[in-house]
Amino acid sequence: MAAVPTYVQVLLPVKLRWIPTYAAPAALEPGQRVCVELGHRRYDGVVWCRQERPELPPERIQPILSVREDLPRVTAEELRFWAFLADYYLCTLGEVYKAAYPLLKTRSEQTAADILTRLQARLEKKNQQLSGKHNERVIQRLTAERDALLAEIAGYCHSERSEESGSFGKPQDDKDGARDGGKPQVRLGAAHREAFLPAIREALAAGRQVLVLTPEIAFCDSMEAFLRPEFGPQLQLFHSGRTPVQRRHTAERLRSGVSALVLGTRSALFLPFRDLALVIIDEEQDPAYKQTEPAPRYHGRDAAIALAGIHGARVLLGATVPSLETLLNIRSEKYALAPVATPAPRAEVIDLAAERRKNGLVGNFSRKLIDAVRQSSGPVLLLRGWEKPEALQEEADTLFPGRDIRIKTLAALKREGADGAAILAVMQADALISRDDFRADERAAQLLGTLGLFAPHILVQTGVPARFSGERSLDDLLAERQQFGFPPCTRLVELRRQGSGEILERHFLPRDRSLAARKADLVSRLAPNTYLDVDPLD
């Protein structure tokens, strides 16, 4: 009796609105890696699901070329996370797979598999040598070499053994999330990082895994300096600045279920966590969490909360000044608020228009800023916007001869820090905030909160002082968004042109039960060479 063929849908790292079906040589499980052909090209794909009754006739279904037992399986939690990203951010599963397993990562896995094959061949040869007759000294040497090979092989295949020994796709209990009533906890204030430590200690003491996200590598560096003294070798870094080998080793460690504290940028969300207990999102308000190109164009904060839900993990968010999205969730009691007592330094706002009217400007410097610098001691950091650095440095040297005056951009400040500056002065704050963005006032409040982390005395020169004065509270801004139907009270979906990113249409969708259907309708009407961007920030 002929064997009944088995069919599976295989996810490929290409943009397809459908998942191809292939004939499998044997029963395969979701997450297994396979080699298939599509359009005369070979791909390493992932088994998405079994298919009992394929839509195509059997003679039109291609066979799987090989099962990649040498590559690690994709976990059930990873597959669920990919499905969330594709569904929420209106992209294809193939685009998510390509982001989660980019070419460099796949090559690194292949390299590891090749090395493992060579090591196993060397081990077999060493065992053959040991089976012969030798004197005691030769036997000791061969035995030591064999044991070294065994240890090296164990380092490459421990994750696969862990995958096979556990129950694939076993759902996590929600004990960590349930302890907080299932709600993410928000820590606000300049010292919010200190509030993360007890939760990290507790998770690691239980032998579990922790993810700490930062918006940029610059924040990773400062967070590493904060965490490394206490958590030492348990701390694993994961971002684009790490080598493929370093990133693969981190992935293997997590896949094996070993306790670890991972510190990374949004790409760390795609790691194969096996026992994730805690997700921390630092500086949750930072727009750098939003992926713009390529798809999936996801927001790291929101994706991290979804990932935590899949794993049943606890969530902590930290910010000096929160995003309005987080504030809305606090006010609607979806999130729990735990303020941190230490306030950020309050900025002194200087009205450039008023200074200009009373001849209070000397080049790019207001009289108030000049007086503040002259009355202070210690280094001064000037945060430039439109100003040319050479011209600004020349002005500073003329006005403050002999003073330690440094000039940086906002990006450099985040990356390098303020170098112990006593004063941090923003030369033209309006250059750092888009005037045409409905989020401008929110961004201004968040900018001041971020600057307060770097220096004790902040001065801000601006042509729009009301924006930076702090007179309008975040609750006022949230009420205004509600009145005019802007996010976060609605969902913004933009239709953009592929390549240029030009905005063709803007859709403000209500946050109700019709949201999913409205998003699906936009996808169905998508024209060639266009794409949809959900929750854009620029």
Kindly label every feature range from the protein language model.
Residues G264-R266, S366-L369, K408-L413, Q446, ...:
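Glycine-rich, charged/polar anion/phosphate-binding loops
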Residues D351-A353, R491-R496, L504-P510:
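Short, hydrophobic beta-strand segments
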Residues S500, F508-A517:
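Helix N-cap motif at beta-to-alpha junctions
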Residues L327-E333, L459-G485:
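A conserved SF2-helicase RecA2
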Residues A303-S323, A444-F468:
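Conserved segment of the helicase C-terminal RecA-like domain
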